[in-house]
Amino acid sequence: MLLTRRFSSALARSPLLPRSLPPPRAVPATPPAPRPPPRRLMSSSSSGWHHSSRPPPPPPSGADKDQLFRGLEAALGTTFSSEPLAPPPQPMILVISGPSGVGKDAVIQRLQEEREGMHFVVTATSRAKRPGEVDGKDYYFVTKEEFLTMIERKELLEYALVYGEYKGIPKQQIRDYMAKGYDIVLRVDIQGAATLREILGESAIFIFLVAESEEALVKRLIHRKTETSDMLLVRVATAREEVKRMNNFDYVVVNSEGNLEGAVKQVESIIDAEKAKVHKRTVNI
């Protein structure tokens, strides 16, 4: 017994043991996980797809057309609009060009006879009238001095010096007819088409008229009998170079001998296709 007390006293004085032990740390209790809310079956009235009150059902199929129409309006809670679904067509600019002798005037004349709502711009020129041409219909025939005045006043959308004579397109004529909803048709030479492409960019439609072959084109130029031999040589040489500009146009239409109607219909198809486009061309003059 005495031995046990001495051992206990010595053990108590030992530096290896702390005099007192700290109280145990309290571990916070983990809160219970929240219970998920009870699942509910979603109905069509509570899904957010419909109003809180179920719409009335449509009338039976035995109803007449007017009752069925009104019943569908009531079921959908709306009225059906009579406004057009497609946006209205916008006025556009059509540029028709090609080498001399391809029949630009013949194609345009048939378009004038076939289609409504189109204005064919009358070009101003300083050259003399040819037999059968009418001032104000085929061209506005002015003197070179008058034409230069129009240039100074910036009255022309485009102008060029072609074979020693001026040709140009009056701006105001285009603005007036586009404001009335008319499509604009411009008949220009290759040089004028290149200038218009720089001015109008992709806002206009460029159509290149061409003969079925080089041989056919030369024969047409000879058949016109409007130029001297020297001028005819210039026309043919120029036409051969102008055909190389075909890639600068949006469409190519072949006006073959004896098939004018086919060429005109193809041009009309191009116009109809452009009218049906979702993304319209925007024109600012």
Curated annotation (Swiss-Prot):
GO terms for biological process: regulation of developmental growth. Disruption phenotype: No visible phenotype under normal growth conditions at the permissive temperature of 30 degrees Celsius, but mutant seedlings develop chlorotic leaves with aberrant chloroplasts under the restrictive temperature of 20 degrees Celsius. Changing residue 162 to I: In v2; reduces specific activity for GMP 20-fold. Development of chlorotic leaves at the restrictive temperature of 20 degrees Celsius. Residues 1-19, 40-50 have a biased composition (Low complexity). Signal peptide: none annotated. PROSITE patterns: GUANYLATE_KINASE_1, GUANYLATE_KINASE_2. ATP binds at residues 98-105, 255. Residues 1-66 are annotated as: Disordered. Residues 91-272 form the Guanylate kinase-like domain. Its EC number is 2.7.4.8. It comes from the Eukaryota. It catalyses: GMP + ATP = GDP + ADP. It is found in: Plastid, Chloroplast; Mitochondrion. One of its GO terms (cellular component) is chloroplast. GO terms for molecular function: ATP binding; guanylate kinase activity. Keywords: ATP-binding, Chloroplast, Kinase, Mitochondrion, Nucleotide-binding, Plastid, Transferase, Transit peptide. NCBIfam families: guanyl_kin. Belongs to the guanylate kinase family. This is Guanylate kinase 2, chloroplastic/mitochondrial. It comes from Oryza sativa subsp. japonica (Rice). The lineage of its organism: Eukaryota, Viridiplantae, Streptophyta, Embryophyta, Tracheophyta. The gene is V2.
